[in-house]
Amino acid sequence: MFVSDLRKEFFDVIVTERVLLLVAPDVDALCACKILQALFQCDHVQYTLVPVSGWQELETLFLEHKEQFRYFVLINCGANIDLLETLQPQEEAIFYICDTHRPIDVVNIYNDSQVKLLIRQDDDLEIPAYDDIFNDDEEDGEDSGNESDGAEPSGKRRRFDEAAVERRIERRRQRREWEARRREIIFDYEQYEYHGTSSAMMMFELAWIMSKDSNDMLWWAIVGLTDQWVQDRITQMKYVTDVGTLQRHVSRHNHRNEDEENSLSIDCMRIAFEYDLRLSLYQHWSLYESICNSCYTSATLKLWSLQGQKKLQEFLADMGMPLKQVKQKFNSMDISLKENLREMLEESANKFGMKDVRVQTFSVQFGFKNKFLASDIVFAVLSLLENTERDEKGTDNFIKALDSLSRSNLDKLHTGLEMGKKLLCAIQQTVASCICTNLILSQGPFLYCYLMEGTPDVKMFSNPISLCLLCKYLLKSFVCSTKNKRCKLLPLVLAAPLDAEKGTVIMVGIPPEAESSDKKNFFGRAFEKAAESTSSRTLHNHFDMSIIELRTEDRSKFLDALISLLS
């Protein structure tokens, strides 16, 4: 059931209760979690926070905690499966779900008592009507008219029996037709996976309704939305619309005419709307390295080729940027160059086919020195979340990533930024390697690439977010590099080694690369059907259905089934 009043139907209900907060490991979920934690602290709500890596862990953790809690809040998990069927909770358990995953399971939508959806209904949900998918009429086993006291003449009784049989046959035919139509409706509804409004934005909306929103909460909402943009999960139109919504809040919280004392305080926090460059981490790197390791510039200039490197030199010369300036840290660049950088870069980018080199975004300044773009925070947090440098537990990474979102933990954020640079370098090197060695193969209805065991940085890509980023960057770069028009329109399936000892791979599928794409992904259902038809040993454990784990020896039969399914 959808919650129409976030305050009355959600917050006011749990404010005096103990709550179990189950949070998925993604940046938007962490931002939503920070906002909710801040609201809980305001009203002294008792809660326990538990990170949840996938469906299996959700079931295990629920079993562990179900006796101690009645109220459960799930962030970015739980909406797209039948939650009550999966968890088998007691009747008094109540689940509040704030999740961007679509489509929402129909049982969750139409359950009025135990499942409460903290999800915006104006998202393009296309929910099937209740009567089309649920049949409340119980089919009578026997027709009541069948019962006879034997007093009627046998001829009349026979005619009565025939009429009852015909009615029963007609009812069964209608039932079969209804069930066939229901299967069709459910298939159409569940066919594509996509994402709705950021959970961090939903939690900020709650804070705003309660008049408890702060600049910190607003910044977390901005980072949550930017995470969706960085990961290409929402359409450009949806992103621009949501940026507009947040921009109004930014104006409200960050007045230009604030008193001088506050605006120059060492503890101050100022958020500003920016029309900034699509260059990852450029303010914390050198401009040269950022251009080389940002997906947009690297793919458009084809930097994996000698011709691309030559084009890069021409591009920098056209900008009038001395190589010495471009290759040193951004902070050390000549001030006059820094001030005019956006305009200079945009003018030259247009000549080199990069017409969308600037994007609507936000920046934050903490005190005098620390300035960050929203995308900087996204890369830092996701790199901390999926850190493979030390063999730490996922929970440790989760806590560090969550801490890095607080402005009192800037040291952790800077650590995340350094790790983000390493991730971006690893992605670009892997993209260059895959394109130069022709590892991307056309399998008919889709492109396929497998990262071999022993590939540099392959361990990084055993994590879902990093693998998805690589997949998106790889497809964009391949589309820019190939001359085959048909291949430009194909989706991509990417697989990487997961656990050598267990002999498993992790696989992700993404829709075709197109600016106008609706970002709807059909691989989730396709993976399920391919696994079913071949009895492949797969694990559908990720909250994103288009990511699966698979036994290495089942890979070829699974792919064959996927090809025939999508052909």
UniProtKB/Swiss-Prot annotation:
Q: Which residues form a coiled coil?
A: none
The answer to keyword Nucleus applying to this record is: yes
Question: Mind telling me which residue stretches traverse the membrane in this protein?
Answer: none
Listed A to Z, the keywords are: Cell cycle, Chromosome, DNA replication, Nucleus
Molecular function terms from GO: chromatin binding; DNA replication origin binding; single-stranded DNA binding
| Matches recorded under InterPro entries | CDC45 (IPR003874)
Q: Is-annotated flag, keyword Iron?
A: no
Q: Which GO terms describe its cellular component?
A: CMG complex; DNA replication preinitiation complex; nucleoplasm
Similarity comment text for this entry? Belongs to the CDC45 family.
Q: What does this protein do?
A: Required for initiation of chromosomal DNA replication. Binds to chromatin in a mutually dependent manner with the GINS DNA replication complex.
Q: Subunit structure, per the record?
A: Interacts with topbp1. Component of the CMG helicase complex, composed of the mcm2-7 complex, the GINS complex and cdc45.
According to UniProt, the name of this protein is Cell division control protein 45 homolog
Protein source organism: Xenopus laevis (African clawed frog)
Which lineage ranks, top first, belong to the organism behind this chain? Eukaryota, Metazoa, Chordata, Craniata, Vertebrata
Encoding gene per record: cdc45
